């Protein structure tokens, strides 16, 4: 089965929410819609489901135009942020509800509910009602109900957003196994780059109703075609600094000059913008082959395992991530270093012209993105 969007557009109250989007989804694949709030992720899902109609363009299933076909006539299931279950029914009955609507036999219902319960680790809770479950168990019930339906297209709209951190991390690690066990097309919406990396599959990078880049998740992460894609796929935010390349040297905004080594050596003379993620900025002095800076601490966020140090240099705001607990008072001046082989370089049109030479050197041990990308299916 193949589901396609062809040049679809949509507006709400005169405001464009989808701008000329084309997208093809194949059976047995996972596509992660990654973008900030209001980037168009939910709008894309509603078009795929048949809940909304595009103003222009078509929705195709195996080449057949289904743009005007009602959602009830489509093989689609959807899981939302909210825990949408029937409160008066047990977990068993919640999972079984779409099968009863389909008129399945008692034996078939029993078989499929038990299979879904095993897959979602809900077997001990089948006799409970949703109010007797944790948030994670409630969302597992909703996912089980979507899977047991046997839909060809399963849409998950930020399904973990309303869970606490521990439950969210637990389900994140289980979802790839659940997806792999099904032959459906899965579309998963998230605002979090780390979630996209953990899930693997393909990433559809979105911004203001447009699809900016589509590709395997590691490829989009390592080789963003534009600065905007790099920004969407960076958490903490992408650090950016302007440079001027001339002959054998580069001058950073703020007046620091350095040899045009590493990736800079192959650039034509001119102006560029350099992007680097938080784990690419070293808080250290005198690292051989690195370009040295000094920057002023504005705030330090301590998460327990990591410290995010916010820095200001010549009106540029940067973030560095350090392992462990580091407390720097506001106003403290730190030495920082940047590896010229380990940056993204963008031209005047913000198109990528150079990426880190080796991904293995791009991500440091313990960083958010590295931990996520260690999942085998994301490599």
Language model segments and positions:
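ABC ATPase nucleotide-binding domain helices that frame the ATP-binding cleft
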Residues: 42-45, 141
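Non-catalytic connector elements of ABC transporters
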Residues: 249-357
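ABC ATPase nucleotide-binding domains
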Residues: 75-77, 81, 85-228
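Conserved ABC transporter NBD signature motif
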Residues: 57-65
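Helix-to-loop junction immediately C-terminal to a conserved catalytic motif
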Residues: 49
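The feature captures the beta-strand-to-loop junction immediately N-terminal to the Walker
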Residues: 34-36
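Conserved coupling/switch loops of ABC nucleotide-binding domains, chiefly the family-specific signature
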Residues: 55-58, 208
């Amino acid at each position: 089965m193949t589901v396609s969007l062809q040049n679809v557009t949509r507006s709400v109250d005169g405001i464009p929410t989808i701008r000329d989007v084309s997208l093809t989804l194949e059976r047995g694949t996972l596509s992660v819609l990654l973008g900030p709030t209001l980037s168009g992720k939910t709008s894309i899902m509603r078009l795929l489901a048949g809940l909304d109609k595009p103003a222009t363009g078509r929705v195709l299933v195996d080449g057949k135009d289904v743009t005007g076909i009602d959602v009830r006539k489509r093989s689609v299931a959807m899981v939302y942020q909210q825990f949408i279950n029937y409160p008066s029914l047990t977990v068993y009955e919640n999972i079984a509800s779409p099968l009863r609507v389909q008129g399945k036999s008692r034996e078939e219902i029993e078989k499929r509910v038990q299979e879904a319960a095993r897959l979602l680790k809900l077997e001990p809770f089948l006799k409970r009602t949703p109010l007797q479950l944790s948030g994670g168990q409630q969302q597992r019930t909703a996912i089980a109900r979507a899977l047991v339906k046997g839909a060809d297209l399963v849409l998950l709209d930020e399904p973990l957003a309303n869970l606490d951190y521990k439950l969210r991390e637990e389900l994140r690690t289980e979802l790839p196994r659940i997806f792999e066990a099904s032959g459906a097309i899965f579309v998963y919406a998230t605002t979090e780059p780390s979630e996209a990396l953990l899930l693997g599959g393909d990433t559809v990078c979105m911004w203001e109703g447009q699809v900016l880049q589509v590709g395997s998740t590691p490829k989009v992460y390592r080789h963003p075609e534009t600065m905007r894609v790099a920004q969407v796929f960076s958490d903490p935010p992408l650090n950016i600094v302007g440079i001027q390349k001339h002959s054998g040297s580069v001058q950073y905004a703020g007046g620091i000059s350095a040899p045009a080594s590493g990736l800079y050596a192959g650039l034509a003379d001119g102006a560029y913008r350099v992007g680097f993620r938080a784990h690419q900025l070293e808080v250290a002095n005198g690292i051989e082959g690195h370009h040295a800076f000094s920057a002023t601490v504005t705030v330090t966020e301590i998460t327990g395992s990591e410290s995010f140090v916010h820095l200001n240099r010549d009106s540029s705001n940067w973030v560095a991530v350090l392992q462990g607990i580091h407390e720097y008072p506001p106003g403290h001046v730190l030495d920082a270093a940047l590896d010229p082989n380990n940056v993204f370089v963008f031209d005047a049109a913000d198109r990528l012209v150079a990426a880190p030479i080796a991904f293995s050197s791009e991500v440091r041990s313990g960083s958010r993105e590295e931990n996520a990308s260690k999942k085998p299916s994301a490599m």
